[in-house]
């Protein structure tokens, strides 16, 4: 018999908020039962799969990774970084907040917008740059206009090539990913590799909370409830109120990536599981 390994990033019920296609869910369930091993991307997903009846004894978690040589702040030219900030009208002495991701409800970007008036009252010299595409594009524009903050929000509803995305990370001061469902969330790893402090959703099935240490000497970011704009605002101000501390968090983030989140580490952990089945 040839062993079968089923790799699972997300599930139909998770992506669709408990709704979705029964046919797809049934196929996922059937494959889980047939497989000798299930590999998923976080311990949060491992527990969620078990909660929905998948056999826990079969499920292993192997984190995703990032290329820290490619995502390296020190390889970005200062003039290229300055061009990004200039493009979005962010002066050198202002703070640039960055969100990158699909513009869909699970990513929490609407909740981030609702957090911004509170942030801007305390830190008016701040701009939020939103990079992504999705069904919430019109809602994002309407929400920022309704909240009276459209002059402090920059949208770019476009696919941005990787090299340019890296420059956006380099140009930012803090990266915010307030997801309410995120099996892993590679954007926070990319930001961490670029030495940026991160504010991440950490309630529910969210892999961010395994990447980001939110207290102690190795802290590299802040955990928030992605469904609560008040909590998101609190998380952002925790970073903005102390630039020196934020720099230290960014350095800690890259150290954590180098230790736990390289693709070599992913390959080694995955190979161990495969070898155990042979």
Regions found by a protein language model. Give the residues of each.
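Nucleotide-sugar donor phosphate/pyrophosphate-binding loop at the beta->alpha transition
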Residues: 2-5, 13-34, 76
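Carbohydrate-associated surface elements
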Residues: 44, 65
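Conserved donor-binding/catalytic core segment of Leloir-type glycosyltransferases
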Residues: 91-107, 113-116
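Nucleotide-activated donor-binding/catalytic signature segment of Leloir-type glycosyltransferases, i.e.
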Residues: 140-159
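Short alpha-helical donor nucleotide-sugar binding micro-motif in glycosyltransferases
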Residues: 159, 167-172
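Aromatic "clamp/platform" in nucleotide-sugar-dependent glycosyltransferases that forms part
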Residues: 180
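Short hydrophobic beta-strand element within catalytic cores of glycosyltransferases
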Residues: 197-207
């Amino acid at each position: 018999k040839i062993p079968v390994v089923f790799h699972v990033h997300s599930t139909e019920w998770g992506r669709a908020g408990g709704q979705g296609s029964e046919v797809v869910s049934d196929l996922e369930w059937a494959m889980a039962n047939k497989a000798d091993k299930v590999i998923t991307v976080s311990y949060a997903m491992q527990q969620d799969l078990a909660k929905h009846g998948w056999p826990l004894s079969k499920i292993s978690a192997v984190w995703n990774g990032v290329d820290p040589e490619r995502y390296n702040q020190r390889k970005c030219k200062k003039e290229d970084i300055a061009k990004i900030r200039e493009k979005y009208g962010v002066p050198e002495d202002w703070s640039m907040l960055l969100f990158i991701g699909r513009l869909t409800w699970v990513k929490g970007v609407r909740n981030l917008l609702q957090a911004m008036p509170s942030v801007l009252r305390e830190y008016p010299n701040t701009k939020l740059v939103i990079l992504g595409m999705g069904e919430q594009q019109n809602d994002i524009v309407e929400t920022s206009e309704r909240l009276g903050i459209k002059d402090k929000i920059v949208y770019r509803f476009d696919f941005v090539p990787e090299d340019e995305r890296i420059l956006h990370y380099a140009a930012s001061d803090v990266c915010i990913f307030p997801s309410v469902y995120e099996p892993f969330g590679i954007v926070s790893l990319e930001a961490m590799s670029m030495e940026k402090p991160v504010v991440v959703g950490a309630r529910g099935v969210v892999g961010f909370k395994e990447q980001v240490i939110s207290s102690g000497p190795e802290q590299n970011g802040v955990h928030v409830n992605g469904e609560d704009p008040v909590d998101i605002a609190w998380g952002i101000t925790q970073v903005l109120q102390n630039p020196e501390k934020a720099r230290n968090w960014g350095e800690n983030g890259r150290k954590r990536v180098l230790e736990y989140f390289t693709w070599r580490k992913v390959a080694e952990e995955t190979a161990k599981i495969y070898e155990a089945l042979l």
